Amino acid sequence: MGQKGHKDSLYDCKGSPVSSLHEALDQCMTALDLFLTNQFSEALSYLKPRTKESMYHSLTYATILEMQAMMTFDPQDILLAGNMMKEAQSLCQRHRRKSSMTDSFSNLVHRPTIDQFTEEEIHAEVCYAECLLQRAALTFLQDENMVSFIKGGIKVRNSYQTYKELDSLVQSSQYSKGESHRHFEGGVKLGVGAFNLTLSMLPTRILRLLEFVGFSGNKDYGLLQLEEGATGHSFRAVLCVMLLLCYHTFLTFVLGTGNVNIEEAEKLLKPYLNRYPKGAIFLFFAGRIEAIKGNIDAAVRRFEECCEAQQHWKQFHHMCYWELMWCFTYKGQWKMAYFYADLLSKENSWSKATYIYMKAAYLSMFGKEDYKPFGDNEVELFRAVPGLKLKIAGKSLPTEKFAIRKSRRYLSPNPISLPIPALEMMYIWNGYAVIGKQPTLTDGMLEVITKAEEMLAMGPENEYSADDDCLVKLLKGLCLKYLGRIQEAEENFRSISANEKKIKYDHYLIPNALLELALLFMEQGRNEEAIKLLESAKQNYKNYSMESRTHFRIQAATLQARSSLEDGNRSLVSSVSL
């Protein structure tokens, strides 16, 4: 590749000019290494002097801020990362060829004029596309229903189109590898992989909008690109690893069916955990993996270890507190779960409404003989929740909206208590897929749910009776499913649809009951029936709590069911042909 044009203007520690991309990338890898050994401030300080001149220093600085924002969900972190990413994007723009990649590159790639681009200009393209991609990711953090993501479609389209062109370039016979080729190719794999993976997960209604303007995603191709990027020894290798770990331990779990490729996650994590045994980020992922496997005590140890590993980045502790809160919920240790919800409500600003709601939810699980700490009263806490509503970039968090809606029944002078609010929120975060790995935990949860069911049956009829009964049946059905009591689970899920017209407030229960029944059928190989149920859940219900999250799960389940059907049909054809 030609080397004409300006170079990346950098300065070393003594103020001498550094002219090569190779040296810039080496310095950025050093900064990433500092970051991964919990030296967060040192990493940023190391990069900062060069962020106004070097696109890689600027992008790495912004990427570290974005990783912090994605780990903490803190509104200030999100704002800071977004502003820095904009600055990095402007700097990359200055280093790009004057005509944009999307305008001119598709014409050039088919002619022997690729050497019109310097190596630096090609790197500027991948860095520019990465800035756009990371800004889109920040938007998703703020707005789970993707409306803003679509509104910013031109930016996203430019990024997507650039990655597609760069992917074609990497595979072109006319491409000659520059000195920093592995870093460039790693950047392409990161972007192409991220786009394909993300687009493959989106609900159909959003996909239709995106595909209308040329977007499409292939999950398998996305995973392959990221896996290749993760093993490529490039500047972006660790970013590919982190994205894959997020996908395997969070996205497929919270926005999917909980059908996690845990072996792949462990394989990805192992070399990094060996290299950075005290690295907080990797200890955190180790905790997530243990939790997903149902090894709750081991998960607790990992999260505690993660907190002990560093004291500088306190907000990273908050992520561990959130996970520890759920670990103790799974174990039915309400006082410990309350302790972590209380810590979060005092120390973290992501969603005070959610944290106070969880405090109240855990207090409501205490027995009459239990000591209620600090004089807190669950009714007063529930009443405080609606007044704590927070907006990030003009949007309310879906979990917060859910907590506020549920708390409103406490605003009446003589409120009717929520039956099992902590266990309901546990469903929203797909926690039953965790306890389902351990029959003892599932049995314990079923016991709590059955007691709540008995209390509802003994109590007087009220305006919430149908809603509360259906909630209990949904959660009971999940426990029964994981205990192998399939017929009973199906009966509980079906009874929710049968009582659809009686439900007054918790309309989310109906599409979610259909989703859970579909997942139950899929486990029995009844994929055609499952697809019909999923289609009904998707098409027939609108404007209910956590709708976007449910649609993500429906999409994941539909893809899984169709894939199983296709595999079954292929097996049938093979056996017939034999």
From Swiss-Prot:
Keywords: Repeat, TPR repeat. TPR repeats lie at residues 280-313, 470-503, 511-544. InterPro entries: Iml2/TPR_39, TPR-like_helical_dom_sf, TPR_rpt. The keyword Repeat applies. One of its GO terms (cellular component) is centrosome. The keyword Transmembrane does not apply. Signal peptide: none annotated. Pfam families: Iml2-TPR_39 (PF10300). Belongs to the TTC39 family. PANTHER family: TETRATRICOPEPTIDE REPEAT PROTEIN 39 FAMILY MEMBER, TETRATRICOPEPTIDE REPEAT PROTEIN 39A. This is Tetratricopeptide repeat protein 39A. It comes from Mus musculus.
